[in-house]
Amino acid sequence: AHMDVDTQNQFAVLQLRRELAQSNDLKIESDCLSYILNHEKKVLYFDKHRIVKSPGYEIYMEQIDEAIFYKKEDGYYVWFKKKNKTYDFELY
């Protein structure tokens, strides 16, 4: 069964929230989000229409036009544009 866009988004956001809930030392570095998980630095970033994680190249979302990670007050967020709609989710 093909997931609709909203379901795909929510699933990806849930995965990111779960990942970040176990992490610490979150920082925004030029629209990317870096954090420490199991003593290793990870970075979430936008690349070639995808939201991915390094090291490695784990893909969380695809077919995205634009995406940025940002901090607002005490929260960390992702903003992205997909099929001419924009979305904004709190991640941490």
State the predicted function of each range.
Residues 17-18, 50-53, 82:
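Arginine residue identity/basic-tract feature
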Residues 23-76:
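Type IV pilin-like appendage domain
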Residues 85-92:
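Edge beta-strands of extracellular beta-sandwich domains
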Residues 77-84:
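Short, exposed beta-strand-loop hairpins at the edges of beta-sheets
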Residues 1-27:
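Membrane-proximal N-terminal amphipathic helix
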